[in-house]
Design a protein with these regions (language model features):
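Carbohydrate transferase catalytic cores enriched for Leloir-type hexosyltransferases
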Residues: 1-386
Length: 386
């Protein structure tokens, strides 16, 4: 494989301080083989995954150093004017202008935007670009997104123009073909790896046994249905709790807990590190994923890495990613067998639990960032004809 220069842009790293999209791009960037000379077109960001790149400064530094000792009405507007006068644009444009500068310079063979803005199109000068599509959630659930959402509008525009499209699962690839009409041979499936540690340096002390729910709880995540269907199991096991990460519970969720007499049974835990996450997974009775749709489902791999039994809605990409190393239930607005499957896991003998965990480790071996980065490098070379 010949050496190739690849330019990534700033988008995911200014959208998120942490999150799946920016973390995935950073893991790929870090694990690319030596034959790929990669650069990220970004000057400042508060994203936690990019902080080790010395040339990238914290975004808040420039903002805070300007009349930092004084607070007064209108200071925010003054900052906007300061940015325009001194940096050629407010913070998002600061990175965008730098990306355009590098695009114009042309020291790359392949461009890989990290989200769906089309700002780069006039500056490619015939060079190919790769587009990663993590999921088709906005297209499949339009009721939860605005009609002019950038993902919907720009995905539709950019996908036909890309030299190659990366899908993170075969299920996502099928959705891209069906919804966007992209030819099969243009879409390459590259699975994610898992960034979790193998052990935890910090053991969280939790007195009650618990089920673990990770991440967002909105809409297609099926959290409300999960609360409804898990109620009989919780009421028959007084010691059991449901530990939830992500944002704090809102009023609607608290009302839902009260309705089912579960006010003390759902507990929110704010996670501040991978070590804490690992410990939460490792101590749980099981990790439960009731979501109706995901592009990949990285928490499945995290649970596998932490030797935590996994209970999945039999939907979307879950069977593809988890294989036979998870337990599956069905869930819809009418019915669910989740209680039956929870009771099964609850009553596992040590031998049965260990057998499931052994399958998880076998399955986990299929996913690594090194393998993903090598596959990506081959695609870069193929489309650049090097």
């Amino acid at each position: 494989m010949s050496d190739i220069r690849v330019l990534y842009d700033y988008q995911a790293f200014t959208m998120q301080t942490h999150g799946g999209v920016s973390r995935c791009f950073m893991e790929l960037y870090k694990h690319l083989p030596g034959s790929v000379n990669a650069q990220i077109a970004i000057k400042e960001s508060d994203n936690v995954y990019i902080k080790d790149i010395e040339s990238v400064k914290p975004a808040h530094d420039r903002y805070n150093k300007f009349i930092c000792r004084y607070n007064f009405w209108g200071k925010g507007h003054l900052h906007l004017w300061y940015d325009k006068l001194t940096q050629g644009g407010y913070y998002p444009d600061y990175n965008k202008n730098y990306a355009i500068e590098l695009l114009k310079k042309g020291d790359f063979e392949v461009f890989h935007p990290t989200f769906f803005s089309d700002y780069f199109l006039p500056y490619l000068n015939g060079r190919p670009f790769v587009l990663t599509i993590h999921d088709m959630i906005p297209e499949l659930y339009p009721q939860y997104f605005s009609r002019d959402d950038i993902q919907v509008v720009m995905k539709k525009k950019l996908a036909p123009l890309a030299s190659a499209i990366i899908a993170v699962s075969e299920n996502t690839k099928k959705d891209i073909i069906r919804i966007l009409g992209i030819p099969d041979n243009k879409i390459h499936v590259i699975y994610h790896g898992c960034s979790f540690p193998h052990t935890s340096k910090r053991e969280i002390q939790i007195s009650n046994p618990y089920l673990l729910y990770v991440g967002d709880r909105n809409n297609y995540k099926n959290f409300d249905l999960f609360v409804q269907y898990v109620t009989p199991f919780l009421l028959s096991h007084a010691e059991m709790r449901v530990m939830c990460t992500g944002r704090s519970f809102n009023c609607k969720e608290k009302e839902l807990f009260t309705k089912h007499q579960l006010e003390e049974r759902f507990v929110h835990y704010w996670v501040s590190s991978d070590d804490e996450f690992f410990s939460l997974y490792h101590q749980a009775l099981c990790f439960v994923y009731p979501s109706e749709y995901e592009g990949f489902g990285i928490p499945i791999l995290e649970a596998y890495k932490a030797s935590c039994p996994v209970l999945l809605n039999n939907a979307s990409c879950f069977p593809e990613i988890a294989g036979d190393a998870a337990v599956y239930f069905h869930m819809d607005s009418i019915d669910s067998d989740i209680v039956e499957k929870l009771e099964k896991i609850y009553s596992y003998s040590e031998k049965e639990r260990n057998a499931l965990l052994a399958k998880q480790q076998e399955r986990l071996a299929l996913y690594s960032w090194e393998q993903s980065a090598n596959q990506m490098a081959k695609i870069y070379c193929d489309i650049a004809s090097i």
